[in-house]
């Protein structure tokens, strides 16, 4: 198994993220998919697989995930033409719910602060 340096691994992940961010809106033209934003790319040390974490605005995450999974092979072939490397990682899409969790936590904190302020004013 061939391993790459962490620096090269990160540069490649960044390049894949930039390329996919350009390709996805162009190749998956569907208003029902909403706005897909790529959060991060995690590559395996041997560069065989890439976990692509995304969020979506204005559509159901499950619908966007299904569409991305269906087009993963096509996006892979487009990346292969762009990257000019021997092995392009297989793409595995994952919905990143951390943004939603962050918003929920922020709302809970706001509610707790508001409740404390009401208690102090009594």
From Swiss-Prot:
GO BP terms, alphabetized: maturation of SSU-rRNA
Annotated Pfam families: RBFA
Entry annotated with the keyword Cytoplasm: yes
One CC-aspect GO term: cytosol
Disulfide bond in keyword set: no
Location in the cell: Cytoplasm
Domain of life: Bacteria
GO MF entry, a single one: ribosomal small subunit binding
Family: Belongs to the RbfA family.
Role summary: One of several proteins that assist in the late maturation steps of the functional core of the 30S ribosomal subunit. Associates with free 30S ribosomal subunits (but not with 30S subunits that are part of 70S ribosomes or polysomes). Required for efficient processing of 16S rRNA. May interact with the 5'-terminal helix region of 16S rRNA.
Assembly, per entry: Monomer. Binds 30S ribosomal subunits, but not 50S ribosomal subunits or 70S ribosomes.
Identification of the protein by name: Ribosome-binding factor A
Protein species of origin: Polynucleobacter necessarius subsp. necessarius (strain STIR1)
